[in-house]
Amino acid sequence: MADEDYNDVDDLGYEDEPAEPEIEEGVEEDVEMKENDDVNGEPIEAEDKVETEPVQRPRKTSKFMTKYERARILGTRALQISMNAPVMVELEGETDPLEIAMKELRQRKIPFTIRRYLPDGSFEEWGVDELIVEDSWKRQVGGD
């Protein structure tokens, strides 16, 4: 069909923009007063909360890093390094992000926290620097 055929169609009564409702002047002031009704009186005094250190409970999980945690830590950190995240160790010619991540793990400089979930739904948080990397993994990472 040609464009000329559509020019004959009448406007179906739709407006481009809906008409704005007229607002009475007195109603506008009432709305502002209603918004401030809950703010009457003096402010409620909040107790000064002192930030306390989380209580160190005896941990239930192992202090050894699992191979799955190690893989995830190294992979995540290597991805960050490849996206130009700041490197936490001195570089000595390394360019591979995974090698740099391994060096950071070896020197315990990776700023991650591992959350281990327990069967009862609770969890424990361990810093990467708190966990022990097993000897067989140290050989792969290049440790002592």
Swiss-Prot record:
What residue spans carry the Acidic residues bias annotation? 1-32
Which cell locations does it reside in? Nucleus
The record's PANTHER family line, in alphabetical order, gives: DNA-DIRECTED RNA POLYMERASE SUBUNIT K (PTHR47227), DNA-DIRECTED RNA POLYMERASES II, IV AND V SUBUNIT 6A (PTHR47227:SF8)
* Assembly description: Component of the RNA polymerase II, IV and V complexes. Interacts with NRPD1.
Cite the record's Basic and acidic residues compositional bias ranges. 46-56
- Return the similarity comment: Belongs to the archaeal Rpo6/eukaryotic RPB6 RNA polymerase subunit family.
Q: Which gene encodes it?
A: NRPB6A
Q: Which molecular function terms from Gene Ontology are attached?
A: DNA binding; DNA-directed RNA polymerase activity
Q: Which domain of life is it from?
A: Eukaryota
Region (Disordered), start-end ranges: 1-62
Q: Which PROSITE patterns match?
A: RNA_POL_K_14KD
Q: Which UniProt keywords apply?
A: DNA-directed RNA polymerase, Nucleus, Transcription
Electron transport listed as a keyword: no
Name the UniProt record assigns to this protein: DNA-directed RNA polymerases II, IV and V subunit 6A
In the record, biological process GO terms are: DNA-templated transcription
Q: Which GO terms describe its cellular component?
A: RNA polymerase II, core complex; RNA polymerase IV complex; RNA polymerase V complex
- Function, in words: DNA-dependent RNA polymerase catalyzes the transcription of DNA into RNA using the four ribonucleoside triphosphates as substrates. Component of RNA polymerase II which synthesizes mRNA precursors and many functional non-coding RNAs. Pol II is the central component of the basal RNA polymerase II transcription machinery. It is composed of mobile elements that move relative to each other.
